[in-house]
Amino acid sequence: MSQVILDLQLACEDNSGLPEESQFQTWLNAVIPQFQEESEVTIRVVDTAESHSLNLIYRGKDKPTNVLSFPFEVPPGMEMSLLGDLVICRQVVEKEAQEQGKPLEAHWAHMVVHGSLHLLGYDHIEDDEAEEMEALETEIMLALGYEDPYIAEKE
């Protein structure tokens, strides 16, 4: 049986109102076992300052972002189940959900799904890659009982 081990780190000044660990686990379980037997993922929920700093250091972007994905590269010849880390910025997720008129829980789920697909090697730089990744995200989100996260862009 496929298993995803979650290491959840809540690093916000105020951690109240965040999704429960079981919700993060459900969202990971909807994505990763399709691609990998056993995995370990760290999800770190942060405030804007940490997100901003990491986004500047690793992507050269001088602002906080919704989710950063840090895939773990296993050295050749070693077998490890560590898939990588997701860093999700609470304030950006909350602001985007409000601006886009999406339920907050659905947007959190989407950020976990989106980031997990990045950990698995998916990207959206090229149009064809973006199309494939968005189709997978939509399929997973619908299976979880949420709306298509890209519905507004398709209308």
Swiss-Prot record:
One of its GO terms (biological process) is rRNA processing. Binds 1 zinc ion. Its EC number is 3.1.-.-. Its cofactor is Zn(2+). Single strand-specific metallo-endoribonuclease involved in late-stage 70S ribosome quality control and in maturation of the 3' terminus of the 16S rRNA. Zn(2+) binds at H114, H118, H124. This is Endoribonuclease YbeY. The lineage of its organism: Bacteria, Pseudomonadati, Pseudomonadota, Gammaproteobacteria, Enterobacterales. Belongs to the endoribonuclease YbeY family. It comes from Escherichia coli O17:K52:H18 (strain UMN026 / ExPEC). HAMAP family: Endoribonucl_YbeY. One of its GO terms (molecular function) is metalloendopeptidase activity. It is found in: Cytoplasm. GO terms for cellular component: cytoplasm. Keywords: Cytoplasm, Endonuclease, Hydrolase, Metal-binding, Nuclease, Ribosome biogenesis, rRNA processing, Zinc. The keyword Metal-binding applies.
